[in-house]
């Protein structure tokens, strides 16, 4: 039986206002709506989120707000443009008492992390094919968060809120 649940959420659809740096781009109306739907799905189908690890970009912070997930959040600059290895290093530093962790980040780091942790099976094929904005991958973790540096997890669900 898994001891922990990892939820990977790609930020909502962003807007592209003139003169706004990439890091500061806000969510588009669709992104706001779908981030709310993502939060609804997470609350309905997953254990309560104990902690959140979120990129510092405006669109990830706004995605977390729109999701209405109420849990202590840690914001990490390293998640902005992060590789799967960098995302895994951030996850590994999570408090061992956390049983359900939500990570809000970007492409390619979020889908690549899901695939690095569980590269086989039908869910991995779907994720490799397409991981759009506001998509969610959930994984069962049998060891500690630190174990994810060199141990796999098992993909349990992949959801695209629309």
Question: Which residues does each PLM region occupy?
Answer:
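Generic beta-sheet signal
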Residues: 6, 96-105
């Amino acid at each position: 039986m898994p001891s922990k649940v990892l939820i990977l959420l790609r930020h909502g659809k962003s807007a592209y206002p003139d003169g706004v740096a990439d890091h500061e781009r806000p969510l588009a109306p669709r992104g706001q709506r779908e981030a709310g739907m993502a939060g609804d799905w997470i609350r309905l189908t997953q254990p309560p989120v104990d902690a959140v690890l979120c990129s510092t970009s405006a669109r990830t912070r706004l995605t977390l707000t729109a999701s209405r997930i109420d849990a202590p959040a840690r914001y990490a600059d390293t998640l902005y443009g992060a590789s799967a290895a960098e995302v895994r290093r951030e996850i590994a530093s999570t408090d061992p008492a956390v049983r359900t962790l939500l990570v809000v980040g970007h492409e390619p780091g979020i889908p690549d992390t899901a695939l690095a942790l569980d590269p086989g099976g039908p869910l991995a094929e779907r994720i490799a094919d397409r991981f759009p904005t506001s998509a969610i991958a959930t994984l069962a973790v049998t060891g500690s968060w630190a174990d994810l540096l060199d141990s796999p997890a098992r993909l349990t669900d992949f959801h695209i809120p629309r």
